[in-house]
């Protein structure tokens, strides 16, 4: 009989692969920024939020906080590095106004240092440490997962799904579903809540995408007029456009 721990590890590995794909999804955007040396209208806010979220989950998964969570540490550690690369690109190609990103990064670093010191010095059991860090992970994870709601409102206003790529919604749904399953096999409420909400939010996106497809109206085709040609004999004395002809072709347009 297959043990629950083995199933959990397999699900976690699949979740790692899907999450890795999600972390890499903005690569083309950043490649365009590098080529054009311009950030244009792109904002660093989502990447700053994801960076903090990854830092919290890495800390949560450490053996000194929540043992047996190596898969949580690995994928969020990878995500931490990827987000740091994205933010470095933002910093290099940003204007002076966007240099405030450095202040936000410093604030996040100080916040994490305060959390780490407070938890390690103030909480002396795994249960208490997991509780404190887990609550923070739920709060910031929920904020990150709820960000697509603003995109959904934009889709409703514009009646266009170009701002909400279907593939990204599907992969996000599978990612949330995978990590929710992982958390339920050996119940972990702190992983279950944000990922369960992620499943709910991305399912709403998929339903909205489907409804938008149904609401698309097919363009109406205007009825095409039909022409009937009638050949009429002309006498030799008749002059048409300065020349004579034996027959005149008259086009009669008929409405369908």
From Swiss-Prot:
Keywords: Cell membrane, Membrane, Repeat, Sugar transport, Transmembrane, Transmembrane helix, Transport. It comes from the Eukaryota. InterPro entries: SWEET (IPR047664), SWEET_rpt (IPR004316). Residues 31-45, 91-100, 152-164, 208-256 are cytoplasmic. Residues 10-97, 133-212 form the MtN3/slv domain. Belongs to the SWEET sugar transporter family. It is found in: Cell membrane. Forms homooligomers and/or heterooligomers. The chain crosses the membrane at residues 10-30, 46-66, 70-90, 101-121, 131-151, 165-185, 187-207. GO terms for molecular function: sugar transmembrane transporter activity. GO terms for biological process: carbohydrate transport. It comes from Oryza sativa subsp. japonica (Rice). The gene is SWEET7E. Coiled coil: none annotated. The lineage of its organism: Eukaryota, Viridiplantae, Streptophyta, Embryophyta, Tracheophyta. GO terms for cellular component: membrane; plasma membrane. Residues 1-9, 67-69, 122-130, 186 are extracellular. Mediates both low-affinity uptake and efflux of sugar across the plasma membrane. This is Putative bidirectional sugar transporter SWEET7e. It is a multi-pass membrane protein.
